[in-house]
Amino acid sequence: SQLPFDFDLASHANERLCAVGHLEVLQAEDIVVYDRGYFSYLLLHRHVQTGIHAIFRLQQNSSSAIQAFFASPQTDIEITLLPSLPTQAEIRSQYPDLEILPLKLRLLKYRIADSVFCLGATLLDAERYPLHEFIDVYHGRWGIEELYKVSKRIFVIEDFHSKTERGVNKEIFAHFVLVTLNRLFSNRADMEINSGQPFTSQNPAMDRPSLKTNFKNCIHVLERGMEELLFLHQRIKAVVQRVFRTICTRHQRVRPNRSYIRRSMRPETK
């Protein structure tokens, strides 16, 4: 759905700690996809403890077992992970109540062009979750990077007006409300432009579409209709329909396997 689930504003720079907090809004059997730098025994332990599955992009120096897997010709194995004694002592000093146990982790490896991707997952059933599905799932995480660009370049999220923590929180929350509102419109538009039939499902990701809504244009269209949506309540239905139909015309063909460098000509915000 590409809808935001949770956000956090913290004074520390520990993204792993924020990730642990985000797990509180999820349910067992949900799946979280992480980029490089997030994997740790503590985060893996929390996922196993909560029943929330994880897919980590692994770095070669994550552990000796992972380093050996990088160097091997194997592409799909299962290991048992237990921190070294010094690492266990460090974990206990910070989390004295944490029970350190051997944890199972599935390691997967594949190559795209000149890049080798190594993933660690708690989805252990190789028959139910084959390697090729992980390739598509991890690639879907690229949408997060695209959202960062949209947030910084279009919503200019880093240009805060408030000078207080509470005010900044409100601005971030308002930003995610706008992202959610635009996603609801673009998801429905994706369904319509690819089916040509009245839609009955709320899930636009049933099949890989051949067309997709241009999300940036969607934002600009909704921006032009926002004042009417907020203040002209008697016309809200007509405005929603007009905005939606306009968004449906702002689409482009899906371009799979894009590998060239993207460069924006837009000046950086000061």
Description of each model-found segment:
Residues S1-K270:
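Single, function-defining residue in the core of a domain
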